[in-house]
Structures are given as structure tokens and as C-alpha cells.
């Protein structure tokens, strides 16, 4: 993808940005297109927006630095035309974001636009986000040049060096202006440019590139879909007509049909898997139950008498007992011990709470565990614990003892897991210390009385760390890979490890996921899981492979406590030979039995433009048996008939970008309020393109199996993250990409989210690997139009999030429409300007919504809605312009689908739907985006998205017609999902048998603020 051309001072070559080397870098070529040469050749960073020095020897460009945030920061760097690594001009520590560099005609100054701090959403552009600065190449000093309201950006110096052209926001308009360098006087050249990128990430500049004509009397600039020459003195514009005939090769977008209605559900998300000390039994938790099966082969069976939900099982060292924790939304949880064969458990703890990760001492007399701060008692969710107390208790009974308080690692991370030293005098655990780039996962130990805390080692991006029973070794996970390392005994500052290189040896034994690492009781083997696959490898096997590696390197050593050479090895490590079993747990897919019919309603089928003015739908079990005009459909005898006269029926909404925020700390509640909120508002299918692997896939299986109620839940799981943070997906080759795709597929994903992998070749590797595994790729759009265009060319399933540039013209619209790549504009967080959700908060007293308050904690809703974070005039809302672009794509034959981004559960999907019409879509077009197009996008249209005989029974009964007024989508009377019928007002089930909605944890235990009577307020 080539862009941003600039003539060299002698007019013989073009400087441009190209990803032809795999990543955006600066290149030059002759005017006839020959002799392409790289100026920068950075393999780690994106470099673009170059400008020549007047002597033609140097080029200045912007280098994006990705850190713990994928947005990152930007520095300016200077490159010689012959190459080299470049010379730094600005530092991120001094200027967090530098952009739009350009030289003065004498070469002394580099002028650029600077943002005073890192990117922040919904900043007030009228206060001036960007201002122009100058860098003096003689003195090394910086000086500010502008301080204007509306910002100042995209500077271009006139040929005589006396004035600088720039762009500025004035109310809802973008102006072209000039700044006199001698007097500071500023002059408006013209009004009417396209919307600038000052409020966006500005990946390739704050406005399209433009230039002065050589005589300095006019400028060439683009707006309105055309190129113009604008006279600097008076703003008179002259069109520069051009025609381009384009023949563009586009890779077929990835899209694979899915079977979401099998007879049985394959359970893939095993948690806490471990093999009994005698090697005969595999123990694990899934679906909120404890299971065991013979190792290595056999069939799983449920251990009996465990209570409502059971998690976190652990064998005693002798294998005779199992410790585990329970959870009930009403009564909270406890720690229990039971015989390994099953039966009634004996409670170890004496106070209800959220417990996790019990571990027996070697003598079996004590058990240590974690206890939460009581989040649900305060009206919070399970993942919102303020802290976790490490405690222990006698197995025989007695008061639990407090040891130390640990931090909450967050719902995307594993809760600390615990173990004892052989003599029972210390407890090992891990926790995170530091923040930002200094964050490390630390292995520590402490005495049971809370004294003598020691730190043993630390690691960047560490996930789990488990110490061997003899205390000599530790197994840990980092970036989804498993390692073994020697455990030092130093009594001083902890050693920092770094994967396979560093001060201590570390051997990578698992490359495609290493969840729930556990040592066998004798310390001779390690177990871990990859979804339904459980591995066990002996320490001897690892050491033999380690020795083999040393032999091949010509440095045979005893691996214990001997450091490796510091060089990073690019070759694959020798293969260990784990024992492996694939747990094949199949449970029946839940669905009701019987027949229910809705009669007399207007039916929007989404089968083309079909609307049945007065029709009947008959549902048998979980599928539509018949549908058609009233009188043409026979209702079977004995069916439950619901009178829907005067109502409107439409397919259930499909939210393809639904962040459910259903996170937990490994312990999953019985009733999940975001699920009920979405169902209550008619969202019957959700697809979350960024979520905790464990939580998302576990709960998806729970819903399918009928253990938990909710919409159909699908997810990418955790993103394939390109930033430098825990959980990143490092992709430096096609093989790396294949490992990540296989890892996610094993967990149950049929989509993955490629998230801000900075280089195009990295994104292409993900696509190639996904195509081989029949996986769809829904990438983070990132507010980068040029990257989005290359994503379309390369065959991504869709673009998640808005194209930040508005308006979009025929070139972009045509490429989108003809590529079959889907567009999810997420208007509530529309990139490039004000987020759409604030428009709805501004125009709706959301805190008074009594229905919403049944599913959302009032305190949370008050905090979001009672004091508006943003107030703006109606002509200043960017999401409407984004919606207008989506309308163009749909009109041209493209696919647009609804994604509400989880900004407000349930009601937010309707806001997103209504936002589509604010850009010009008709109600019928918006409803298609919310139903059948969303289903088609992720390969579900065989089963859902339209109302046809044989499809799954997912639909909504409305009191009013949304084709007449789109706001009538929020008049939900009944919700039907998978054949079950609920009251849309309170989510009490109506059919096949009445059932009152259960209380949520924050209702049943917490100090919930009751919805107030808002009359008169």
C-alpha cells in the first residue's frame, strides 16, 4: 500500500510511504516508478509521513512506538536518503505525540504538530489539542509557534519561508489558514475542508497531505472528493480534474458457515485440570461442576453432592481428598474438602465469600486459599474485588488464619495460585508489582503467620508460576507459552527472567498455550491444558531435551542453576514428549420441548424485503416450524397460542461487537446480568470480539448447555494483541500465527481478533493461518483508514470500528462494497470525533429507565448518566457522519452490521440501531444491519438472522412498528430465544414453564440501591 508522495527538491525522485517490505517505511523511486529504494527499514515500528530536507540528503518522518498501549506514542526521526537507523528528533518523554513534519526552505527548522499529551478520547478540539512547534537543527531547541483555539496542525512552509499553511477547526468546520512567521498574524485562506483528524489517533497525519505551488501563490489540497488549487490570498478554489481507471485485486474475505445447533455441545473449556498422585485419575472443573475421568483414557463423570456451583479442585498430596470451592449467587461461596471418590463435602471455612485456589500442605492437615474482599456484599460483580486475602485453615476444622493481602490482577488474568513448601513452613504465591512498562509478575513466599516475605524471581508478562514440590524448579507461562526454570535461593533481590534468555536457564516446553500449569505430587511431572487437551510431561523428558539442546550448541552442562548464553535463539526448541489426552465431554444442547405459536402480528421476516402484514409463527422445540399469513399456517393441537394482534415481530438482534463485561475472577456466577439485559432488549445473539478466554468460552458453553441463561454467546476470546503487555500475541512469522490460531480454535473460537499488530505482514500471516483453519478474522480497525484499506485488500472478514475519515467517497465505498468485507461502525464509540453514546446520554434521562435498572446496578448507571461527560451541539456529533458513510457502503451493496461495543448493556444496541438512521439509513436498512447482516457476517445466517421455517426460533415481539419509527424497536413485549419465551419487561420466563428471573449476585447479597420512583423528579 503506497501513499504520501513527495517530490524531491530536484524533482527527480518521489518520497513515499509503503508497506511493500512488510511494514510502513519510507521509500524513494524515480518518477517513472523504477528504482525503488528504502530510506528507513525498521522491522519493529511503523514509519510514515516523510518530508525531504531542502538539500535532498535527509528525510524526516514519524515513528510510532507501541508500548503497553496499542495506540502508543509518536516520535520524529531523521534519516539519510542512503539509509541507516535514523537519528531521533523528538522524544516521547518530552513530546508524547509529534506529527506532520516539514522542513523550512533553508533546512534549519523542522516544523511539526504536537499533541500535549497522549491520545485521549472525546477531548475538546476547540481548546486546541494540537499546536505547531519548531525544532531548530542548529541549536537543538524547540519553540512553540501557535496557540490557537481549534488547534493548529499539518503545517506546510511556503517556498519563500515567510509563512506556514496549516489547518484548524472552527466550530464544525475545518479551515485552511496561514501563519506569518515574522508577525505571528494568522489568516483564513478558506473554509470547507473535509473533517480533520485532530480528534483521532492521526496515524498518518492530522489531514491529507497538501503542498504549496512553486510560486508560493496557491496551494494544492484535497477536499470534497477532488483535488483543488486554492489561491492563498483570497481562497479562490480551482478544480484540478483527474480520472483514474482502477483494476484492483482483492483477496476473498474470510467467511465460514458455522453449525450452532448441534445435538450435543462439545465442552472445551476445562479449568484446574490435574492428575491424581497415583497417576490414575484426571480431575477438572467445567460447567460449574467437578469432573473426573481415568487417566490417560476414559470418560468423564460428575463428582456428586457439590452444591450449586463448584470450582477450583485440588488433590491432597496422598490423593485421598479433594479441596474445592463453591459458589451460589444467594449464599456466596465456601471452601470444602471431600473424599476423592466423591460424596458429601466438609466445609473448611466459616464465612461466606468468594474463594479460590485451595492447596493442601504436604501432610494434608492444612489448606491455603484465596478469599475476596466481599465485592458482591457491596453491590459489585465478582471481578470487582478490591483485594484477595491469602489465608489458610486446618482441614479438621478451626478458624481460618489471615496471611497476606494480594492485589486483584483483573479479569483477563489468572488469580494467584498457591502451593506449600515440603516442610509446610512457607506458602508460595505470585502477584504483580509495578505498573506500565515496569510491571512484573513476582514469585514470592511467606510464612503462614504472615512474616518473612521473600521474593524469588520476577518476569515480564508472566501469567502463572507454580513451584515444584521439592522447591528446586518453577514452571511458568509467558505470552501463552510454558517454561521450566531453576528456582534460585539467594535471599536478596529477585532475579528477573526473560523467557529462554536471562540469568537463569529456562526451557520452553509448551508453545501453543499452557493453561493451568500444575505439578504432580511427586514433583516428577508437569500437567497443563490447551482447551480440552491435557498434557503431562516428565521433568526427566524436559531435562533430556535440554541436554540435547546443549549438546547441539556444543556446551553440555548440568541444566540446574547454570545460565544459558544470552543470545536469543530463533530456532524452535527440541520437542518434549508429553502424555496427552483429549477430554471428550459431550452434553445435550439445551432447548425446550413443545409447541408455541404467535398469531396475528405484523412479521418483518428479513427474508429479502418480506413483511407479512398479519401472520403466524409456530415454534416447535427450538425451531420455527411454520411461518406465513394468518390462515395459511396450521397451529398444531395442544400448542400454547399467544395473541400477538397489533404487535410487530422481528428477528432477534445480532450484536456482532458486544463487549459483555461479564468478567469474573475464575469463579462464574449463576445469573449474569449483562446476559439478561441483552435478552430483555431483544438481543438474542452476541459476539464479543475481545474477552477473557476462560470467561467467554466457559460461559458460551454454559449457555448452550442450559446451565446459564443468556443470549447465544460467541467470542474471539482474548485478542491477538500487538502491544507490549501481558497476554500479547507475538507474531514474527507465519508459524507464530499458526500457533496462535490453533490455540484459539482449540478453545472454541471460530473468529479471532487481530488487534493492532503493527505490520501488514503480521496481519497477513494471521489471515493465512486462519484460512487454513477455517477461522474468520475480525480485526481492530484502530481508526486508521489506510490500514483498513489494506485489511480489505488482504481479505479480512470485516473491519471493527469506524473509518475515522468523514466523509468517505466513491473509492473507499466501492472497495468496501465489492470486497465482501463487513463493516461494523460501532457508532457509540465512533473514531475520529465525539463518541455517539454521549449524544444519547445528552438526549435521554437514562437514570430514570426503570426497566434498565432491573438489569444494571443503579449506582453504576447514575455514575454514567446523571452528570453528562460531554455536551455538544447537534452539528458537532461525528457518529452521524460515520453513519452516513455506512449508509453509502450499504447502498453500494456492502455489508454493514450492528455492534454496540458494550457501552450500555441491552439498551445500547438500540442506540446503535437508531444511530444508523441518524446517518440516513431507513428503518428497514438499519434493521437489516441489526439482524440478517450480522448473522451473515460471522457465518450464522443458516440458523438465525431471518424468520424462516427450519431456522432457530430467535425473535422479538414489539408493541409498535419499527418500520414506521425506528425507536419502536424498544417496545419489547416478549423475547423468544431458542424457543423459550420471556417477558421483555422483567425477564420472567413465560414458556415452556413459568419461572421468575433469579436475583443477580449484586442484588441478592449486595447493598443494592432500589430503583426510585422517578415521578416528579
What role is predicted for each listed range?
Residues 1-4, 9, 15-27, 36-47, ...:
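A flexible loop/linker signature enriched in serine peptidases of the S9 family
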Residues 609-650:
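Histidine-rich, glycine-flanked metal-binding segment
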Amino acid at each position: 500500500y503506497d501513499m504520501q508522495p513527495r517530490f524531491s527538491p530536484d524533482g527527480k525522485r518521489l518520497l513515499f510511504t509503503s508497506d511493500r517490505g512488510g511494514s510502513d517505511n519510507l521509500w524513494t523511486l524515480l518518477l517513472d516508478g523504477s528504482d525503488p529504494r528504502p530510506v528507513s527499514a525498521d522491522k519493529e515500528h511503523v514509519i510514515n509521513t516523510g518530508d525531504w530536507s531542502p538539500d535532498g540528503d535527509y528525510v524526516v518522518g514519524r515513528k510510532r512506538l507501541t508500548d503497553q498501549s496499542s495506540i502508543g506514542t509518536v516520535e520524529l526521526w531523521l534519516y539519510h536518503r542512503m539509509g541507516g537507523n535514523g537519528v531521533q528528533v523528538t522524544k516521547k518523554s518530552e513530546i508524547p505525540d509529534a506529527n506532520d513534519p516539514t522542513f523550512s526552505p533553508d533546512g534549519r527548522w523542522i516544523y511539526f504538530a504536537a499533541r500535549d499529551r497522549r491520545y485521549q478520547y472525546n477531548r475538546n478540539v476547540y481548546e486546541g489539542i494540537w499546536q505547531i512547534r519548531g525544532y531548530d537543527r542548529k541549536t537543538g531547541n524547540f519553540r512553540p509557534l501557535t496557540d490557537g483555539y481549534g488547534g493548529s496542525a499539518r503545517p506546510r512552509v511556503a517556498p519563500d519561508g515567510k509563512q506556514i499553511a496549516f489547518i484548524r477547526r472552527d466550530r464544525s468546520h475545518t479551515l485552511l489558514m496561514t501563519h506569518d512567521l515574522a508577525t505571528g498574524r494568522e489568516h483564513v485562506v478558506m473554509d470547507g475542508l473535509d473533517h480533520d483528524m485532530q480528534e483521532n489517533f492521526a496515524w498518518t497525519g492530522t489531514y491529507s497531505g497538501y503542498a504549496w505551488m512553486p510560486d508560493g501563490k496557491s496551494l494544492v489540497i484535497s477536499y470534497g472528493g477532488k483535488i483543488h488549487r486554492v489561491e492563498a490570498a483570497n481562497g479562490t478554489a480551482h478544480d484540478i480534474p483527474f480520472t483514474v481507471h482502477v483494476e484492483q485485486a482483492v483477496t476473498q474475505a474470510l467467511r465460514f458457515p458455522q453449525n450452532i445447533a448441534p445435538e450435543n455441545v462439545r465442552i472445551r473449556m476445562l479449568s484446574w485440570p490435574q492428575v491424581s498422585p497415583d497417576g490414575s485419575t484426571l480431575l477438572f472443573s467445567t460447567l460449574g461442576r467437578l469432573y473426573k475421568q481415568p487417566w490417560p483414557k476414559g470418560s468423564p463423570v460428575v463428582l456428586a453432592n457439590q452444591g450449586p456451583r463448584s470450582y477450583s479442585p485440588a488433590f491432597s498430596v496422598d490423593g485421598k481428598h479433594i479441596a474445592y470451592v463453591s459458589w451460589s449467587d444467594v449464599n456466596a461461596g465456601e471452601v470444602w474438602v471431600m473424599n476423592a471418590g466423591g460424596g458429601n463435602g466438609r466445609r473448611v471455612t466459616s464465612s461466606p465469600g468468594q474463594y479460590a485456589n485451595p492447596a493442601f500442605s504436604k501432610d494434608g492437615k492444612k489448606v491455603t486459599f484465596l478469599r475476596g474482599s466481599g465485592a458482591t456484599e457491596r453491590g459489585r460483580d465478582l471481578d470487582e474485588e478490591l483485594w484477595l486475602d491469602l489465608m489458610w485453615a486446618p482441614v479438621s476444622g478451626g478458624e481460618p488464619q489471615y496471611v497476606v493481602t494480594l492485589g486483584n490482577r483483573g479479569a483477563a488474568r489468572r488469580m494467584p495460585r498457591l502451593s506449600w513448601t515440603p516442610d509446610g513452613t512457607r506458602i508460595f504465591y505470585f502477584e504483580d508489582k509495578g505498573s506500565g512498562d515496569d510491571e512484573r509478575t513476582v514469585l514470592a513466599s511467606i510464612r503462614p503467620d504472615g512474616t518473612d516475605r521473600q521474593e524469588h524471581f520476577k518476569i515480564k508478562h508472566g501469567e502463572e508460576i507454580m513451584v515444584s514440590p521439592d522447591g528446586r524448579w518453577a514452571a511458568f507461562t509467558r505470552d501463552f507459552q510454558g517454561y521450566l526454570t531453576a528456582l534460585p535461593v539467594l535471599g536478596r533481590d529477585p532475579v528477573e527472567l526473560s523467557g529462554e534468555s536471562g540469568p537463569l536457564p529456562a526451557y520452553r516446553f509448551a508453545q501453543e498455550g499452557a493453561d493451568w500449569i500444575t505439578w504432580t505430587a511427586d514433583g516428577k511431572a508437569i500437567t497443563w491444558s490447551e482447551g480440552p487437551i491435557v498434557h503431562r510431561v516428565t521433568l526427566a523428558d524436559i531435562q533430556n531435551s535440554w541436554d540435547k539442546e546443549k549438546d547441539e550448541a556444543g556446551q553440555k552442562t548440568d541444566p540446574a542453576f547454570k545460565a544459558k548464553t544470552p543470545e536469543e535463539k530463533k530456532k524452535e526448541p527440541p520437542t518434549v514428549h508429553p502424555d496427552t489426552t483429549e477430554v471428550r465431554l459431550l452434553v445435550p444442547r439445551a432447548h425446550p420441548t413443545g409447541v408455541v405459536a404467535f398469531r396475528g402480528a405484523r412479521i418483518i421476516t428479513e427474508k429479502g424485503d418480506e413483511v407479512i402484514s398479519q401472520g403466524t409463527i409456530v415454534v416447535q422445540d427450538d425451531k420455527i416450524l411454520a411461518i406465513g399469513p394468518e390462515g395459511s399456517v396450521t397451529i398444531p393441537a395442544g400448542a400454547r397460542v399467544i395473541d400477538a394482534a397489533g404487535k410487530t415481530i422481528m428477528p432477534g438482534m445480532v450484536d456482532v461487537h458486544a463487549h459483555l463485561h461479564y468478567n469474573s475472577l475464575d469463579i462464574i456466577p449463576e445469573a449474569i446480568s449483562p446476559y439478561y439485559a441483552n435478552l430483555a432488549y431483544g438481543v438474542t445473539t452476541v459476539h464479543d470480539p475481545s474477552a477473557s478466554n476462560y470467561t467467554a468460552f466457559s460461559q458460551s458453553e454454559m449457555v448452550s448447555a442450559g446451565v446459564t441463561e443468556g443470549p447465544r454467546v460467541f467470542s474471539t476470546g482474548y485478542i491477538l494483541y500487538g502491544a507490549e503487555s501481558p497476554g500479547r500475541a507475538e507474531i514474527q512469522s507465519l508459524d507464530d500465527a499458526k500457533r496462535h490460531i490453533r490455540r484459539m480454535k482449540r478453545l472454541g473460537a471460530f473468529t479471532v481478533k487481530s488487534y493492532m499488530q503493527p505490520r501488514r505482514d503480521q496481519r497477513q500471516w494471521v489471515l493465512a493461518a486462519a484460512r487454513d483453519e477455517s477461522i474468520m478474522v475480525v480485526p481492530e480497525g484502530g481508526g486508521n483508514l489506510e490500514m483498513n484499506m489494506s485489511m480489505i485488500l488482504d481479505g479480512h472478514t470485516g473491519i471493527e470500528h469506524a473509518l475515522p475519515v468523514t466523509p468517505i467517497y466513491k473509492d473507499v465505498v466501492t472497495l468496501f462494497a465489492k470486497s465482501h468485507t463487513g463493516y461494523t461502525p460501532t457508532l457509540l464509540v465512533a473514531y475520529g470525533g465525539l463518541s455517539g453514546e454521549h449524544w444519547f446520554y445528552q438526549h435521554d434521562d437514562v437514570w430514570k429507565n426503570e426497566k434498565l435498572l432491573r438489569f444494571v446496578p443503579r449506582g453504576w448507571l447514575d455514575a454514567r448518566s446523571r452528570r453528562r461527560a460531554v455536551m455538544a451541539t447537534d452539528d458537532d456529533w461525528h457518529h452521524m457522519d460515520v453513519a452516513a458513510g455506512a449508509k453509502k457502503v450499504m447502498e453500494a451493496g456492502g455489508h454493514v452490521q450492528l455492534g454496540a461495543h458494550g457501552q450500555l448493556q441491552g439498551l445500547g444496541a438500540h442506540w446503535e440501531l437508531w444511530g444508523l438512521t441518524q446517518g440516513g439509513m431507513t428503518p428497514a436498512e438499519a434493521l437489516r444491519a441489526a439482524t440478517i447482516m450480522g448473522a451473515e457476517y460471522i457465518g450464522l445466517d443458516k440458523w438465525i438472522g431471518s424468520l424462516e421455517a427450519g431456522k432457530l426460533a430467535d425473535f422479538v415481539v414489539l408493541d409498535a412498528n419499527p418500520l414506521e419509527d425506528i425507536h419502536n424497536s424498544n417496545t419489547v413485549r416478549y423475547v423468544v430465544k431458542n424457543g423459550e419465551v420471556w417477558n421483555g419487561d422483567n425477564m420472567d420466563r413465560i414458556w415452556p414453564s413459568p419461572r421468575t428471573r433469579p436475583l443477580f449476585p449484586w442484588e441478592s447479597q449486595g447493598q443494592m440501591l432500589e430503583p426510585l420512583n422517578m415521578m416528579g423528579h
